[in-house]
Amino acid sequence: VPNLTETAAGLVAPRGRITLTRHTIEQEHRHLDSTGDFSGLLNAIATAVKIIANQVNRGGLAAPADRLARASNEVMTAETLWGGHLAATASAASGGIVAVPAPYRRGKYLLAYSPLDGSDGIDVNQSAGTIFSVLRTPRPGADPRIEDFLQPGTEQVCAGFALYGPATMLILTTGDGVDGFTLDRDIGAFVLTHPRMRVPEQTREFAINSANERFWEAPVRRYIGECLAGRSGPREQDFTMHWVASLVADAFRILTRGGVVLYPADSNPGRPGRLRLMHACNPIAFLVEQAGGRAGTGRGRTMELAPARLDQAAPLVFGSRAEVERIERYHGEPGDESFDGSLFNVRSMFRAG
């Protein structure tokens, strides 16, 4: 017997699981001018994610990590170009754009993506993922150009990431909150399991690659130093530090447990950041902001940056709002030298031995 419920209008409707397909169609029904292109694009992305997840889950049985990364890029391109929803794609793996070829119809959306973030850790069974960002093409019907993609993150229509871990998950925002879907392999569909995700406000966790400490600017050194000082320091509480070198894993942890993740600017002006603005920073920033958190460069909002190049890099600091705002405040204070490293007895904050 189907699991049914009576609606306010007296109609009988299914009350079962909400799949990604049903979710996106219901979202589109709220817009009278909707053509169905957007839900079609999301379904194509979901199909690509399922294929990539199957390859990743096979690990070394399928291919080495570098071949998996190339294969993931090919899957994303192949599954999204033919449906008539896109004008072009831009992959972090290729560095350029791929226009929808004839005879396929060109749509009104642009897709920027990182096909397999964290692929370097696959050989040690670490979680990897796919990050994507959807924009509207500024010149519908015209041959797409790289310049069409150079829009600030505030122009994103949709952003999300897939996480290939113990479960395959798809985290998504269309500008109205963040929802998490888990792949149910029995039915072959993504099912809503984490509705209306919110970044916890109170947190005592942070993530940063301490191997790059020598490149950090003074405000970042100050923030990390205060966290490491624990109860005896100015924060008067103990913090937990972690680092997995997987942006998607860190982003999911932020959405579920709170905290702050830092990919800070380097003191070297020739390297302003370590992550791609269009393919990684903007989509993660959109998700975090829609979940009530904050994402920035340490000095300002990530999504307000005006990209000059498709491969432009940027710093990224994201997580619980209060922690990100504290880091921004430290960057705004004059001097930026208030942190005294001698409190830790050695030049590094991470004491040896």
What are these regions (language model features)?
Residues 1-63, 68-89, 94-353:
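IMPase-like, lithium-sensitive Mg2+-dependent phosphomonoesterase catalytic core
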